[in-house]
Amino acid sequence: MDSLENLILVGVIKSCHGIKGHIILRSFTDPTVKITERELVNESGEKVNINLIKQNSKGELICQFNDISTRNEAANLKGYKLFCLRSSLPKLEEDEFYITDLNNLPILDNNHTEIGKIKNILNFGAGDIIEVEFLDKTTELLPFNKDFFPIITKDYAILNYKRDEL
């Protein structure tokens, strides 16, 4: 079993599709079909085999597990998470990050005082949005760009933003 630190979440089963045990897979890879080119494992580190059937008109992946053949079996998989080993992923460029590495990352102001953490990373189609949870437990959505986050390391992110500006 691999520790969750060594696993990167790359997909989640959204729902079943049809009567033959197919599932709709929400892929977090870019492009989305790249998920089927990776060796996938579950949370316990056990190998998972899926086959891509097609990509639908919404861009979702229709897939099938080797050992799932009915709609009822597929329906039970809703929310099932798929991971790949961190070691199997390509080396990242200097300003690239895996979402899992940014979640809960401390956020500092320009004086290096902790002011909150990254709660979530969202994308609604126009670019990544960072959900920031401040120390007072309030949250704000901010664009993920160099203007707002000029410095990001594996240990912290600097936020260039005064809360009363917006």
Swiss-Prot record:
CC per GO annotation: cytoplasm; ribosome
Protein's GO biological process: ribosomal small subunit biogenesis; rRNA processing
Family: Belongs to the RimM family.
InterPro entries documented for this protein: PRC-brl_dom, PRC_barrel-like_sf, RimM, RimM_N, RimM_N_sf, Transl_B-barrel_sf
One Pfam family in the UniProt entry: PRC
GO molecular function: ribosome binding
Subcellular location: Cytoplasm
Function: An accessory protein needed during the final step in the assembly of 30S ribosomal subunit, possibly for assembly of the head region. Essential for efficient processing of 16S rRNA. May be needed both before and after RbfA during the maturation of 16S rRNA. It has affinity for free ribosomal 30S subunits but not for 70S ribosomes.
Summary of subunit composition and partner proteins: Binds ribosomal protein uS19.
Transmembrane segments: none
Main localization (coarse): cytoplasm
Every PRC barrel domain range: 94-166
Top-level taxonomy: Bacteria, Pseudomonadati, Pseudomonadota, Alphaproteobacteria, Rickettsiales
Domain comment in the entry: The PRC barrel domain binds ribosomal protein uS19.
Entry keyword set: Chaperone, Cytoplasm, Ribosome biogenesis, rRNA processing
Protein name (record): Ribosome maturation factor RimM
Domain of life: Bacteria
